[in-house]
A protein has these predicted regions:
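Charge-dense, helix-prone N-terminal extensions
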Residues: 1-132
């Protein structure tokens, strides 16, 4: 499910994310594309948004995570990360916070795809239980 903008002349968030991936044109774009694919596999009904002047955000009954791109890192920030189990210890940033946790991916890093999809599914379940 893709969320589209109702404003005339604005591109859908999904198209903006596509353009960002293409614009990056390097390992960051490849990483963001791979992460996006994994998120969609884990949560097929995910909604994509484009926030804060260029940050992809994935929603399902609330925010799941962002996909921020910087010069040397792709940062995946989970809004309720502190409440998620992370048995494979994917979270490696923002560990001191009360709510958020992040996964920083640098060039050449390997992401445990199975563990990542489990985190996405758990975040979706947590959002669903909070929405009731």
């Amino acid at each position: 499910m893709k969320k589209t903008s109702s404003s005339k002349g604005r591109e859908s968030p999904s198209l903006l994310i596509d353009a960002r991936i293409e614009e990056l044109g390097d390992w960051r774009g490849e990483t963001l594309s791979r992460v996006r694919r994994l998120i969609k596999q884990a949560a097929p009904k995910v909604v994509e948004e484009w926030k804060w002047r260029g940050v992809p955000v994935w929603y399902h009954d609330g925010m799941i995570c962002t996909g921020e791109t910087y010069q040397s890192v792709v940062k995946l920030t989970f809004f309720k990360g502190a409440q998620l189990k992370d048995p494979k210890r994917l979270f490696n940033s923002g560990l001191e916070g009360n709510a958020r946790r992040a996964i920083d991916l640098h060039e050449g890093d390997q992401l445990d795809e199975t563990a990542f999809k489990a985190l996405i599914r758990e975040a979706v379940a947590l959002n669903g239980s909070s929405a009731r």
